[in-house]
From Swiss-Prot:
Annotated spans, Disordered: 476-499
Keyword Disulfide bond: yes
GO biological process: endocytosis involved in viral entry into host cell; virion attachment to host cell
Summary of subunit composition and partner proteins: Self-assembles into homopentamers. The capsid has an icosahedral symmetry and consists of 72 capsomers, with each capsomer being a pentamer of L1. Interacts with the minor capsid protein L2; this interaction is necessary for viral genome encapsidation. Interacts with protein E2; this interaction enhances E2-dependent replication and transcription activation.
HAMAP family xrefs: PPV_L1
Main localization (coarse): virion
Stated role: Forms an icosahedral capsid with a T=7 symmetry and a 50 nm diameter. The capsid is composed of 72 pentamers linked to each other by disulfide bonds and associated with L2 proteins. Binds to heparan sulfate proteoglycans on cell surface of basal layer keratinocytes to provide initial virion attachment. This binding mediates a conformational change in the virus capsid that facilitates efficient infection. The virion enters the host cell via endocytosis. During virus trafficking, L1 protein dissociates from the viral DNA and the genomic DNA is released to the host nucleus.
Pfam family, one: Late_protein_L1
Any coiled-coil regions, as ranges: none
SUPFAM superfamilies from the UniProt entry: Group I dsDNA viruses (SSF88648)
Name assigned to this protein: Major capsid protein L1
Species whose genome carries this gene: Human papillomavirus 33
Length: 499
Protein backbone atom coordinates (compact mmCIF):
# COMPACT_ATOMS: atom_id res chain seq x y z
CA UNK A 1 0.00 0.00 0.00
CA UNK A 2 1.51 3.33 -1.07
CA UNK A 3 1.28 6.28 1.30
CA UNK A 4 1.87 9.89 0.22
CA UNK A 5 4.26 11.84 2.40
CA UNK A 6 4.96 15.56 2.06
CA UNK A 7 8.45 16.53 1.02
CA UNK A 8 10.73 17.47 3.88
CA UNK A 9 12.97 19.59 1.65
CA UNK A 10 12.97 23.34 2.18
CA UNK A 11 11.09 25.23 -0.49
CA UNK A 12 12.57 28.60 -1.45
CA UNK A 13 10.20 31.12 -2.95
CA UNK A 14 11.54 33.67 -5.43
CA UNK A 15 12.03 37.17 -3.99
CA UNK A 16 9.54 39.88 -4.63
CA UNK A 17 10.56 41.75 -7.80
CA UNK A 18 11.89 45.24 -7.14
CA UNK A 19 12.89 48.04 -9.43
CA UNK A 20 16.52 47.84 -10.46
CA UNK A 21 19.01 50.63 -10.08
CA UNK A 22 20.39 51.57 -13.48
CA UNK A 23 23.45 53.48 -14.51
CA UNK A 24 23.18 57.17 -15.29
CA UNK A 25 24.44 56.38 -18.80
CA UNK A 26 21.01 54.88 -19.60
CA UNK A 27 19.05 58.11 -19.13
CA UNK A 28 21.72 60.84 -19.35
CA UNK A 29 22.92 61.84 -22.82
CA UNK A 30 26.34 63.46 -23.11
CA UNK A 31 27.10 66.34 -25.42
CA UNK A 32 30.34 67.45 -27.00
CA UNK A 33 30.46 70.63 -24.90
CA UNK A 34 33.14 70.85 -22.21
CA UNK A 35 33.93 73.53 -19.65
CA UNK A 36 36.90 74.22 -17.44
CA UNK A 37 36.51 75.45 -13.86
CA UNK A 38 39.17 76.18 -11.30
CA UNK A 39 39.37 77.64 -7.84
CA UNK A 40 41.68 80.32 -6.57
CA UNK A 41 44.57 79.51 -4.28
CA UNK A 42 43.01 78.01 -1.13
CA UNK A 43 44.97 78.70 2.06
CA UNK A 44 44.52 77.66 5.69
CA UNK A 45 46.62 78.72 8.69
CA UNK A 46 46.18 77.63 12.30
CA UNK A 47 47.51 75.77 15.31
CA UNK A 48 48.29 72.11 14.57
CA UNK A 49 47.27 70.67 17.95
CA UNK A 50 44.28 72.63 19.22
CA UNK A 51 42.24 75.76 18.60
CA UNK A 52 42.87 78.95 20.57
CA UNK A 53 39.67 80.26 22.15
CA UNK A 54 38.86 83.78 23.22
CA UNK A 55 39.33 84.05 27.02
CA UNK A 56 36.24 86.24 27.35
CA UNK A 57 34.06 84.31 24.88
CA UNK A 58 34.69 80.58 24.62
CA UNK A 59 32.47 80.28 21.55
CA UNK A 60 34.73 82.57 19.54
CA UNK A 61 37.99 81.20 18.15
CA UNK A 62 41.06 83.36 17.91
CA UNK A 63 43.12 80.75 16.03
CA UNK A 64 41.50 77.66 14.46
CA UNK A 65 42.95 74.18 14.54
CA UNK A 66 44.67 73.44 11.22
CA UNK A 67 46.57 70.18 11.12
CA UNK A 68 48.08 68.03 8.41
CA UNK A 69 46.16 65.13 9.97
CA UNK A 70 42.74 66.63 9.19
CA UNK A 71 40.29 65.90 6.41
CA UNK A 72 39.76 68.66 3.91
CA UNK A 73 36.23 68.30 2.54
CA UNK A 74 35.59 70.80 -0.27
CA UNK A 75 31.98 71.45 -1.21
CA UNK A 76 32.28 72.78 -4.75
CA UNK A 77 29.25 74.75 -5.93
CA UNK A 78 28.53 74.66 -9.66
CA UNK A 79 26.29 76.95 -11.71
CA UNK A 80 22.89 75.70 -12.78
CA UNK A 81 23.34 74.68 -16.44
CA UNK A 82 19.62 75.24 -17.07
CA UNK A 83 20.20 78.94 -16.33
CA UNK A 84 23.48 79.06 -18.22
CA UNK A 85 23.93 81.41 -21.12
CA UNK A 86 24.95 79.27 -24.09
CA UNK A 87 25.82 80.85 -27.44
CA UNK A 88 23.76 78.17 -29.20
CA UNK A 89 20.81 76.51 -27.45
CA UNK A 90 19.71 74.35 -30.35
CA UNK A 91 21.35 71.25 -28.89
CA UNK A 92 18.56 70.70 -26.35
CA UNK A 93 14.85 71.35 -25.83
CA UNK A 94 14.15 73.13 -22.52
CA UNK A 95 10.53 71.94 -22.59
CA UNK A 96 11.37 68.24 -22.52
CA UNK A 97 14.98 68.14 -21.33
CA UNK A 98 17.11 69.32 -18.44
CA UNK A 99 20.86 69.92 -18.33
CA UNK A 100 23.32 68.50 -15.80
CA UNK A 101 27.08 68.52 -15.32
CA UNK A 102 29.33 65.47 -15.48
CA UNK A 103 32.81 65.61 -13.96
CA UNK A 104 35.31 64.11 -16.42
CA UNK A 105 38.59 65.60 -15.18
CA UNK A 106 40.11 66.53 -11.84
CA UNK A 107 43.45 67.78 -10.59
CA UNK A 108 44.18 68.60 -6.95
CA UNK A 109 47.12 70.94 -6.62
CA UNK A 110 49.14 70.96 -3.42
CA UNK A 111 51.57 73.67 -2.51
CA UNK A 112 54.21 73.83 0.22
CA UNK A 113 57.25 71.53 0.54
CA UNK A 114 57.20 67.94 1.69
CA UNK A 115 57.69 67.53 5.40
CA UNK A 116 56.93 65.36 8.40
CA UNK A 117 54.95 66.85 11.24
CA UNK A 118 55.16 65.41 14.72
CA UNK A 119 52.79 65.42 17.64
CA UNK A 120 52.93 64.27 21.22
CA UNK A 121 51.78 64.86 24.73
CA UNK A 122 53.57 66.64 27.58
CA UNK A 123 51.99 64.09 29.96
CA UNK A 124 51.68 60.85 27.99
CA UNK A 125 50.76 57.65 29.82
CA UNK A 126 53.99 55.83 29.00
CA UNK A 127 55.44 53.68 31.76
CA UNK A 128 58.36 51.63 30.46
CA UNK A 129 60.20 50.68 27.29
CA UNK A 130 59.14 47.10 26.51
CA UNK A 131 61.37 46.71 23.46
CA UNK A 132 64.91 46.66 24.85
CA UNK A 133 64.51 46.43 28.61
CA UNK A 134 67.71 45.27 30.37
CA UNK A 135 66.09 44.71 33.75
CA UNK A 136 62.63 44.08 35.08
CA UNK A 137 61.10 47.39 36.14
CA UNK A 138 59.50 48.06 39.45
CA UNK A 139 55.90 48.90 40.09
CA UNK A 140 54.62 52.22 38.75
CA UNK A 141 54.13 55.11 41.11
CA UNK A 142 51.23 57.48 41.45
CA UNK A 143 52.05 59.36 38.25
CA UNK A 144 54.52 58.05 35.67
CA UNK A 145 53.49 60.18 32.71
CA UNK A 146 56.24 61.52 30.48
CA UNK A 147 56.69 64.08 27.73
CA UNK A 148 56.87 62.17 24.45
CA UNK A 149 56.50 63.05 20.77
CA UNK A 150 56.22 60.97 17.61
CA UNK A 151 55.37 61.13 13.93
CA UNK A 152 52.18 59.64 12.58
CA UNK A 153 50.96 57.20 9.99
CA UNK A 154 51.39 58.47 6.42
CA UNK A 155 48.20 58.90 4.41
CA UNK A 156 47.33 60.33 1.01
CA UNK A 157 43.67 60.24 0.07
CA UNK A 158 41.31 61.69 -2.51
CA UNK A 159 37.56 60.99 -2.67
CA UNK A 160 35.18 62.36 -5.30
CA UNK A 161 31.39 62.29 -5.24
CA UNK A 162 28.29 64.46 -5.36
CA UNK A 163 27.45 63.65 -1.72
CA UNK A 164 29.69 64.02 1.34
CA UNK A 165 31.76 60.96 2.26
CA UNK A 166 30.76 58.56 5.01
CA UNK A 167 33.18 57.75 7.81
CA UNK A 168 33.28 55.11 10.50
CA UNK A 169 34.65 55.05 14.03
CA UNK A 170 34.21 53.12 17.26
CA UNK A 171 32.22 54.83 19.97
CA UNK A 172 30.63 54.00 23.28
CA UNK A 173 27.69 51.65 22.88
CA UNK A 174 24.63 51.06 25.00
CA UNK A 175 25.02 48.46 27.73
CA UNK A 176 22.27 46.08 28.77
CA UNK A 177 20.41 46.66 32.03
CA UNK A 178 22.17 43.76 33.77
CA UNK A 179 25.60 44.83 32.58
CA UNK A 180 28.77 45.34 34.61
CA UNK A 181 29.35 48.45 36.76
CA UNK A 182 29.88 51.81 35.12
CA UNK A 183 33.63 51.86 35.78
CA UNK A 184 34.23 48.71 33.73
CA UNK A 185 35.11 48.57 30.05
CA UNK A 186 32.28 50.18 28.06
CA UNK A 187 30.69 48.34 25.14
CA UNK A 188 31.81 49.40 21.68
CA UNK A 189 29.64 50.32 18.73
CA UNK A 190 30.60 51.00 15.13
CA UNK A 191 29.20 54.42 14.26
CA UNK A 192 28.75 55.90 10.79
CA UNK A 193 28.90 59.67 10.42
CA UNK A 194 29.52 62.15 7.64
CA UNK A 195 33.15 63.20 7.33
CA UNK A 196 33.35 66.96 7.80
CA UNK A 197 36.10 69.42 7.09
CA UNK A 198 38.49 69.44 10.05
CA UNK A 199 37.80 65.91 11.29
CA UNK A 200 40.90 63.98 12.31
CA UNK A 201 42.14 61.04 10.26
CA UNK A 202 43.42 57.73 11.57
CA UNK A 203 46.89 58.50 12.92
CA UNK A 204 47.88 54.93 13.81
CA UNK A 205 46.00 54.67 17.11
CA UNK A 206 42.73 53.50 15.57
CA UNK A 207 39.52 55.19 14.47
CA UNK A 208 37.66 55.83 17.70
CA UNK A 209 36.13 58.48 19.93
CA UNK A 210 39.09 59.22 22.19
CA UNK A 211 37.24 61.86 24.18
CA UNK A 212 34.62 59.35 25.35
CA UNK A 213 36.65 56.14 25.52
CA UNK A 214 39.84 57.44 27.17
CA UNK A 215 39.09 59.16 30.47
CA UNK A 216 42.70 59.90 31.46
CA UNK A 217 43.36 62.16 28.43
CA UNK A 218 46.91 60.82 28.37
CA UNK A 219 46.91 57.70 26.21
CA UNK A 220 47.31 59.50 22.86
CA UNK A 221 48.83 62.83 21.73
CA UNK A 222 47.09 66.08 22.52
CA UNK A 223 45.78 66.72 19.00
CA UNK A 224 43.51 63.66 19.11
CA UNK A 225 42.93 63.01 22.85
CA UNK A 226 39.79 65.17 22.74
CA UNK A 227 38.70 64.33 19.19
CA UNK A 228 37.27 61.52 17.11
CA UNK A 229 39.47 59.94 14.45
CA UNK A 230 37.43 58.75 11.48
CA UNK A 231 38.20 56.33 8.68
CA UNK A 232 36.33 56.36 5.34
CA UNK A 233 33.75 53.59 5.21
CA UNK A 234 34.73 52.27 1.80
CA UNK A 235 32.52 49.18 2.18
CA UNK A 236 29.39 51.26 2.71
CA UNK A 237 30.15 53.87 0.06
CA UNK A 238 31.01 51.32 -2.64
CA UNK A 239 27.83 49.37 -1.91
CA UNK A 240 25.60 52.46 -2.06
CA UNK A 241 22.79 51.78 -4.56
CA UNK A 242 23.09 55.00 -6.57
CA UNK A 243 26.83 55.59 -6.15
CA UNK A 244 26.58 59.30 -5.34
CA UNK A 245 29.02 59.36 -2.43
CA UNK A 246 31.97 57.85 -4.24
CA UNK A 247 32.72 58.18 -7.94
CA UNK A 248 36.30 57.02 -7.42
CA UNK A 249 39.00 57.26 -4.78
CA UNK A 250 42.78 57.35 -4.58
CA UNK A 251 44.44 56.01 -1.46
CA UNK A 252 47.96 55.46 -0.22
CA UNK A 253 48.72 54.49 3.38
CA UNK A 254 51.90 53.31 5.05
CA UNK A 255 53.09 52.91 8.62
CA UNK A 256 55.61 51.09 10.72
CA UNK A 257 56.13 50.88 14.47
CA UNK A 258 59.07 52.79 15.92
CA UNK A 259 58.96 52.16 19.71
CA UNK A 260 57.16 49.79 22.08
CA UNK A 261 55.85 50.84 25.49
CA UNK A 262 53.27 49.83 28.07
CA UNK A 263 50.73 51.78 30.06
CA UNK A 264 50.67 52.53 33.74
CA UNK A 265 47.50 52.02 35.71
CA UNK A 266 45.37 49.25 37.09
CA UNK A 267 44.50 46.59 34.56
CA UNK A 268 40.77 46.10 34.36
CA UNK A 269 41.31 42.60 32.97
CA UNK A 270 44.28 40.85 34.58
CA UNK A 271 46.37 38.25 32.81
CA UNK A 272 45.03 34.76 33.63
CA UNK A 273 47.21 32.75 36.02
CA UNK A 274 47.42 29.78 33.66
CA UNK A 275 49.31 31.85 31.07
CA UNK A 276 52.48 32.37 33.16
CA UNK A 277 54.44 30.96 36.09
CA UNK A 278 54.69 33.27 39.06
CA UNK A 279 58.11 34.65 39.90
CA UNK A 280 59.88 35.94 42.96
CA UNK A 281 61.60 39.13 43.89
CA UNK A 282 61.08 41.84 41.29
CA UNK A 283 59.01 39.48 39.14
CA UNK A 284 56.61 38.57 41.92
CA UNK A 285 54.22 41.17 40.56
CA UNK A 286 53.99 41.24 36.80
CA UNK A 287 54.05 44.47 34.87
CA UNK A 288 51.25 46.02 32.88
CA UNK A 289 50.31 44.11 29.75
CA UNK A 290 48.64 47.14 28.16
CA UNK A 291 51.22 47.44 25.40
CA UNK A 292 51.15 50.11 22.73
CA UNK A 293 53.48 51.26 19.96
CA UNK A 294 54.38 54.67 18.60
CA UNK A 295 53.51 54.82 14.89
CA UNK A 296 55.65 56.29 12.15
CA UNK A 297 54.92 57.06 8.53
CA UNK A 298 58.55 56.72 7.45
CA UNK A 299 60.09 58.72 4.61
CA UNK A 300 58.12 61.08 2.40
CA UNK A 301 59.17 61.43 -1.21
CA UNK A 302 57.94 63.15 -4.34
CA UNK A 303 57.98 59.84 -6.23
CA UNK A 304 54.91 58.58 -4.37
CA UNK A 305 52.66 61.63 -4.67
CA UNK A 306 48.99 61.36 -5.63
CA UNK A 307 48.54 65.09 -6.11
CA UNK A 308 49.54 67.66 -8.72
CA UNK A 309 48.60 65.32 -11.56
CA UNK A 310 45.39 64.99 -13.63
CA UNK A 311 42.85 62.19 -13.30
CA UNK A 312 40.20 61.39 -15.92
CA UNK A 313 36.90 59.78 -15.04
CA UNK A 314 35.88 57.36 -17.78
CA UNK A 315 33.81 54.97 -15.69
CA UNK A 316 32.83 55.42 -12.04
CA UNK A 317 32.79 52.52 -9.61
CA UNK A 318 29.05 52.92 -8.94
CA UNK A 319 25.92 53.58 -10.95
CA UNK A 320 26.52 57.33 -10.97
CA UNK A 321 29.06 57.89 -13.71
CA UNK A 322 30.18 61.33 -12.57
CA UNK A 323 26.84 63.19 -12.77
CA UNK A 324 26.83 66.13 -10.35
CA UNK A 325 23.29 66.06 -8.97
CA UNK A 326 22.36 69.26 -7.17
CA UNK A 327 25.05 71.20 -9.06
CA UNK A 328 27.67 70.33 -6.49
CA UNK A 329 30.60 68.00 -6.04
CA UNK A 330 32.50 66.98 -2.90
CA UNK A 331 36.27 66.56 -2.96
CA UNK A 332 37.80 64.99 0.16
CA UNK A 333 41.56 65.27 0.58
CA UNK A 334 44.08 63.97 3.11
CA UNK A 335 47.79 64.62 2.72
CA UNK A 336 50.10 64.01 5.67
CA UNK A 337 53.24 64.31 3.54
CA UNK A 338 53.07 68.10 3.90
CA UNK A 339 52.43 68.31 7.63
CA UNK A 340 55.38 70.46 8.66
CA UNK A 341 54.72 72.50 11.80
CA UNK A 342 56.49 75.84 11.76
CA UNK A 343 57.88 77.33 14.97
CA UNK A 344 57.58 81.09 15.45
CA UNK A 345 59.43 83.05 18.10
CA UNK A 346 58.87 86.55 19.44
CA UNK A 347 61.05 88.53 21.83
CA UNK A 348 59.47 89.70 25.07
CA UNK A 349 62.40 91.60 26.56
CA UNK A 350 65.79 92.37 25.09
CA UNK A 351 68.83 91.18 27.00
CA UNK A 352 72.46 90.63 26.15
CA UNK A 353 72.32 87.19 27.80
CA UNK A 354 70.07 84.46 26.44
CA UNK A 355 67.24 83.59 28.78
CA UNK A 356 64.29 81.35 28.01
CA UNK A 357 61.81 83.72 29.61
CA UNK A 358 62.79 86.47 27.18
CA UNK A 359 61.12 84.68 24.26
CA UNK A 360 57.72 83.27 23.39
CA UNK A 361 57.35 80.22 21.16
CA UNK A 362 54.41 79.63 18.82
CA UNK A 363 53.49 76.79 16.47
CA UNK A 364 51.60 77.15 13.19
CA UNK A 365 50.66 74.86 10.31
CA UNK A 366 49.82 76.10 6.82
CA UNK A 367 48.08 74.38 3.90
CA UNK A 368 47.75 75.31 0.25
CA UNK A 369 45.33 73.82 -2.28
CA UNK A 370 44.21 74.40 -5.85
CA UNK A 371 41.25 72.60 -7.44
CA UNK A 372 40.78 72.25 -11.21
CA UNK A 373 37.95 70.49 -13.02
CA UNK A 374 36.75 69.65 -16.50
CA UNK A 375 32.98 69.27 -16.77
CA UNK A 376 30.95 67.83 -19.63
CA UNK A 377 27.49 69.15 -20.38
CA UNK A 378 24.79 66.46 -20.38
CA UNK A 379 21.05 66.41 -20.90
CA UNK A 380 18.24 64.35 -19.41
CA UNK A 381 15.09 63.68 -21.44
CA UNK A 382 12.11 64.00 -19.11
CA UNK A 383 10.00 61.00 -19.91
CA UNK A 384 7.50 59.67 -17.40
CA UNK A 385 9.70 56.68 -16.63
CA UNK A 386 12.82 58.78 -16.10
CA UNK A 387 11.04 61.28 -13.87
CA UNK A 388 9.59 58.47 -11.76
CA UNK A 389 13.04 56.95 -11.37
CA UNK A 390 14.66 60.27 -10.42
CA UNK A 391 11.87 61.03 -7.95
CA UNK A 392 12.47 57.69 -6.23
CA UNK A 393 16.22 58.36 -6.19
CA UNK A 394 16.14 61.97 -4.97
CA UNK A 395 12.97 64.08 -5.15
CA UNK A 396 14.98 67.26 -4.53
CA UNK A 397 16.38 67.00 -8.06
CA UNK A 398 12.95 67.46 -9.64
CA UNK A 399 12.19 70.24 -7.19
CA UNK A 400 15.35 72.07 -8.24
CA UNK A 401 14.21 71.61 -11.84
CA UNK A 402 10.94 73.31 -10.84
CA UNK A 403 8.83 70.22 -11.21
CA UNK A 404 6.12 69.63 -8.65
CA UNK A 405 2.49 68.91 -8.06
CA UNK A 406 0.24 71.82 -9.02
CA UNK A 407 -2.79 72.00 -6.71
CA UNK A 408 -6.16 72.13 -8.47
CA UNK A 409 -7.98 75.47 -8.51
CA UNK A 410 -10.08 75.97 -5.43
CA UNK A 411 -13.84 76.16 -5.97
CA UNK A 412 -14.61 77.47 -2.50
CA UNK A 413 -15.50 81.09 -1.81
CA UNK A 414 -12.54 83.24 -0.76
CA UNK A 415 -12.71 86.18 1.66
CA UNK A 416 -11.39 89.57 0.58
CA UNK A 417 -11.38 92.54 2.94
CA UNK A 418 -11.63 96.11 1.71
CA UNK A 419 -9.60 97.95 4.36
CA UNK A 420 -6.61 95.67 4.65
CA UNK A 421 -4.72 98.04 7.00
CA UNK A 422 -7.59 98.46 9.42
CA UNK A 423 -7.00 97.46 13.04
CA UNK A 424 -10.56 96.18 13.25
CA UNK A 425 -9.79 93.08 11.18
CA UNK A 426 -7.26 90.32 11.42
CA UNK A 427 -3.81 90.96 10.06
CA UNK A 428 -3.76 90.60 6.29
CA UNK A 429 0.02 90.57 5.96
CA UNK A 430 1.10 87.69 3.80
CA UNK A 431 3.72 85.43 5.30
CA UNK A 432 6.69 85.11 2.94
CA UNK A 433 7.47 81.55 1.91
CA UNK A 434 10.27 79.90 3.80
CA UNK A 435 13.51 79.43 1.99
CA UNK A 436 14.48 75.87 1.23
CA UNK A 437 16.68 74.53 3.98
CA UNK A 438 20.02 73.08 3.05
CA UNK A 439 19.94 69.40 4.08
CA UNK A 440 23.70 69.60 4.68
CA UNK A 441 23.64 72.97 6.42
CA UNK A 442 24.43 71.52 9.85
CA UNK A 443 27.72 70.06 8.63
CA UNK A 444 31.02 71.87 8.17
CA UNK A 445 32.63 71.95 4.71
CA UNK A 446 35.12 74.15 2.93
CA UNK A 447 32.87 76.05 0.55
CA UNK A 448 34.30 76.63 -2.95
CA UNK A 449 32.09 78.68 -5.28
CA UNK A 450 32.73 78.06 -8.99
CA UNK A 451 29.46 79.54 -10.27
CA UNK A 452 31.26 82.35 -12.06
CA UNK A 453 34.49 80.55 -12.96
CA UNK A 454 33.43 78.37 -15.88
CA UNK A 455 35.18 78.83 -19.20
CA UNK A 456 34.74 77.13 -22.57
CA UNK A 457 38.31 78.04 -23.60
CA UNK A 458 39.95 74.88 -22.35
CA UNK A 459 43.24 75.64 -24.08
CA UNK A 460 43.77 78.67 -21.83
CA UNK A 461 44.22 76.55 -18.69
CA UNK A 462 46.73 73.81 -17.77
CA UNK A 463 44.19 71.08 -17.04
CA UNK A 464 42.16 72.05 -20.12
CA UNK A 465 45.18 71.63 -22.39
CA UNK A 466 45.91 68.23 -20.87
CA UNK A 467 42.31 67.20 -21.48
CA UNK A 468 42.37 68.32 -25.10
CA UNK A 469 45.59 66.39 -25.64
CA UNK A 470 44.41 63.10 -24.16
CA UNK A 471 40.95 63.37 -25.77
CA UNK A 472 42.36 64.10 -29.21
CA UNK A 473 40.46 67.37 -29.49
CA UNK A 474 41.68 70.59 -31.01
CA UNK A 475 41.06 74.05 -29.69
CA UNK A 476 39.29 76.55 -31.87
CA UNK A 477 41.70 79.00 -33.46
CA UNK A 478 41.60 82.42 -31.85
CA UNK A 479 43.39 84.39 -34.53
CA UNK A 480 42.42 84.46 -38.18
CA UNK A 481 45.26 83.84 -40.52
CA UNK A 482 45.87 86.44 -43.15
CA UNK A 483 44.89 85.30 -46.63
CA UNK A 484 47.95 84.78 -48.84
CA UNK A 485 48.36 87.49 -51.47
CA UNK A 486 49.26 86.28 -54.97
CA UNK A 487 51.55 88.57 -56.98
CA UNK A 488 51.63 88.25 -60.75
CA UNK A 489 54.63 89.28 -62.74
CA UNK A 490 53.47 90.38 -66.16
CA UNK A 491 55.97 89.71 -68.86
CA UNK A 492 56.94 92.72 -70.91
CA UNK A 493 55.55 92.65 -74.43
CA UNK A 494 58.05 92.70 -77.22
CA UNK A 495 57.83 95.55 -79.58
CA UNK A 496 57.37 94.61 -83.15
CA UNK A 497 60.13 95.93 -85.31
CA UNK A 498 59.31 96.66 -88.90
CA UNK A 499 61.86 95.37 -91.28
Amino acid sequence: MSVWRPSEATVYLPPVPVSKVVSTDEYVSRTSIYYYAGSSRLLAVGHPYFSIKNPTNAKKLLVPKVSGLQYRVFRVRLPDPNKFGFPDTSFYNPDTQRLVWACVGLEIGRGQPLGVGISGHPLLNKFDDTETGNKYPGQPGADNRECLSMDYKQTQLCLLGCKPPTGEHWGKGVACTNAAPANDCPPLELINTIIEDGDMVDTGFGCMDFKTLQANKSDVPIDICGSTCKYPDYLKMTSEPYGDSLFFFLRREQMFVRHFFNRAGTLGEAVPDDLYIKGSGTTASIQSSAFFPTPSGSMVTSESQLFNKPYWLQRAQGHNNGICWGNQVFVTVVDTTRSTNMTLCTQVTSDSTYKNENFKEYIRHVEEYDLQFVFQLCKVTLTAEVMTYIHAMNPDILEDWQFGLTPPPSASLQDTYRFVTSQAITCQKTVPPKEKEDPLGKYTFWEVDLKEKFSADLDQFPLGRKFLLQAGLKAKPKLKRAAPTSTRTSSAKRKKVKK
